[in-house]
């Protein structure tokens, strides 16, 4: 608030220099007050958007439960919120998103036509944000995830790598007790046990086919939540980087998507029009609007191997 008041004071003094020699002191006071209030509001919005990605459950809950702050952020134009998120990510370190250089299919532009259905609207409630402090690497990790079974959240291994206490935050800003119970750094999949999470599991579907129009959901750039369209350009084998060792993995099956994937989308679901999960976002190309996702068949195999785990596992080391 001090910064906002200071900005308003400067603006007010500038106006006063003019109004002191005119009979407009009443108007000057009015507009000075408006500028002061607007500056204070802007500072509060910037702080709220910036601080909600800090992995402190008490702070996350307090910000989400404040009706005034929630209204102010909701009333802020999207272009302003996007700019705040971009600046925040430029100033603060939020980990990395894997980049894939080997193309499976020719690249095309990301679609602009969105897929709308009641099933997708319902599925959005089961998509969560993952926050965590990777102390070894000195950054805050942000990513996405989704409920795949009762009390079980799926995300990427690189999202929680080196994070001892990840925070699972739902669309209402509530945070939940959690434990990482599965890590597969080769396939870049991790499971988080959240026993009290009151969200419906999403159905795991079958692999999508080339040319399919799908929707990917998550919290790009640390939020807010977005559901964006994508086209499956192809499905095939490519080489990716191990989330723990940093070395190249063996060839594995992935989707190549025409999609505007950003940091923070990692771990979010790719869904068909019926709300079925057909993939999990994990990376993007080195340039252009091309993203990559783990296939539904790979996810099903991982769930069969570790979906019932309850014991905590090591999250390994983070990668700068």
Task: Report the location of each language-model feature.
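Short secondary-structure boundary/capping segments
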Residues: 119-120, 181-182, 206, 246-247
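Conserved active-site neighborhood of the chymotrypsin/trypsin-like protease fold
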Residues: 134-142, 149-226, 309-314
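Sec-exported extracytoplasmic/periplasmic mature domains
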Residues: 16, 35, 52, 216-219, ...
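Alpha-helical transmembrane segments and their juxtamembrane interface "caps"
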Residues: 1-112
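N-terminal activation segment of mature serine protease catalytic domains
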Residues: 63-144, 165, 302-305, 309-320
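Second-shell loop/turn segments in exported
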Residues: 105-106, 117, 135, 199-204, ...
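Active-site region of chymotrypsin-like
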Residues: 125-131, 190-201, 226-319
